[in-house]
Regions:
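N-terminal beta-alpha supersecondary unit
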Residues: 6-116, 122, 126, 159
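A short helix-loop
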Residues: 2-6, 13-14, 21-24, 29-31, ...
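Conserved phosphate-binding catalytic cores of ATP/NTP-utilizing and phosphoryl-transfer enzymes
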Residues: 1-4, 144, 148, 152-174, ...
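Short Gly/Thr/Asp-enriched flexible loops that form oxyanion-binding sites at enzyme active sites
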Residues: 122-146, 321-330
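A contiguous, well-structured pocket-lining segment that forms one wall/lid of small-molecule binding clefts
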Residues: 74, 78-113, 228-311, 320-334, ...
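Conserved phosphate-binding/catalytic loops in two-lobed NTP-binding clefts
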Residues: 152-153, 311, 327-353
Length: 384
């Protein structure tokens, strides 16, 4: 398999984004991310609903990225051999739990020539297992039909790659991974060498944002709404005297806790009674400041402890304006080289999965995908 100029298909279905991307080496051929809006009315992501949405949307997105990359060619020979029939029967077994996807697959795939895809990089975890399985089974079905190898990718490694790809980083480095399901400090002694040195003991930071947004009566997803309100008053603060705790700020270790901060917001909101728009803005601003202060303090501590001068930040919460600016200021003042995902690639996407697959191919570190399974609780340092 080509190592440097491979065409790689990336597939990401770990939560509520259905995402596919095609790359040729470091060149992006196509990249589409579809966010499932159906969850907004429920204030959170329902795994089985996410699974159904992935199954409905994967094939149409796949068609689109093939067309965008000019890789969709009508098949020349339409003669169905016994071998072809056996392959399609195997596909039927792979996708038996996704009948809508199976129907779309059998209608479209036999009508096109095999595209020159060298490998399929797909998220194996962590994430919602029903959602992960749809992407994995789609990858397995394509691999079965076209005899293409699968590269299992850790979703959190994808977030690191989205910040680092195409750049030169010095090791040791520290990665701060902040998302709806994770708040982790990861020590990297080299590429693919990960050690989790700090993590949340309860709520992840993105989860805390969503829960506080719910307390304030804001729509889902809560992170952007909290940020919007906070930014509207940050410069003036409206004379607010609100003060929320900075959990585990001086705990002496590298761990986090955001459950108590969320509870403090709940008690404050109950004490204040009916919240005005200004109240909501001031609470959002103080909450965001508290989170940011803790994240910066813990990261500063781990960088000093391991004498690291490189900081990598990835995950959906890294799109937050206040958090980004705080870390940019911190890095500039402390001679730290900062790598942070662009806002467009901070949230879940398939481009980071494809690039992670490419990096593993180049380094001969690609894991076998023959026995790939969905692993909802997969750790970044787990090489199963």
């Amino acid at each position: 398999m080509p190592k440097k100029s491979a065409i790689i298909l990336g597939i990401e279905t770990s939560c509520d984004e259905t995402a596919l991307a095609l790359i040729y080496g470091e060149k992006v051929l196509a990249n589409i991310t579809l966010t499932q809006t159906v969850h907004q009315q429920y204030g959170g992501v329902f795994p089985m609903m996410a699974k159904r949405e992935h199954a409905k949307n994967l094939l149409p997105i796949f068609k689109k990225i093939l067309e965008t990359a000019n890789l969709s060619k009508p098949i020349q020979s339409k003669i169905l051999t016994k071998k072809h029939s056996d392959i399609l029967e195997n596909v039927g077994m792979i996708l038996e739990r996704e009948p809508e996807l199976l129907g779309q697959f059998l209608e479209f795939i036999p009508t096109i020539e095999k595209p020159p895809i060298d490998a399929i990089a797909v998220t194996e975890g962590p994430g919602l297992e029903p959602a992960l399985w749809v992407g994995i089974n789609f990858a397995k079905a394509l691999a079965t039909v076209w005899n293409i190898p699968i590269i299992p990718i850790n979703h959190m490694e994808g977030h690191i790659v989205s910040a680092l790809f195409g750049k030169i980083a010095n090791f040791p480095a520290v990665a701060l991974l902040i998302s709806g399901g994770h708040t982790e400090l990861v020590l990297m002694k080299d590429w693919f060498d990960y050690e989790i040195v700090g993590a949340t003991k309860d709520d992840a930071v993105g989860e805390a944002f969503d829960k506080v947004a719910r307390i304030l009566g804001l729509p889902y997803p809560g992170g952007p709404e909290i940020s919007r309100l906070a930014e509207s008053v940050r410069e003036v603060k409206k004379g607010s005297t609100l003060k929320l705790p900075r959990p585990m700020l001086n705990s002496g270790d590298l761990n986090f806790s955001f459950s108590g901060l969320k509870t403090a917001v709940l008690y404050l909101a109950k004490k204040m009674g009916e919240l005005s728009e200004d109240d909501k803005k001031n609470i959002a601003c103080e909450f965001e400041d508290a989170v940011t202060e803790v994240l910066v303090a813990k990261t500063k501590k781990v960088l000093a402890q391991f004498d690291a001068k490189t900081l990598i930040i990835g995950g959906g919460v890294s799109a937050n304006k206040n958090i980004r600016e705080a870390f940019e200021n911190f890095a500039g003042q402390n001679n730290i080289k900062l790598f942070i995902s662009s806002r467009e690639l901070a949230t879940d996407n398939a481009l980071m999965i494809a690039f992670a697959g490419l990096l593993r191919l180049k380094a001969n570190k690609a894991k076998s995908g023959e026995k790939i399974t969905a692993q909802g609780n997969l750790k970044i340092n787990d090489d199963r």
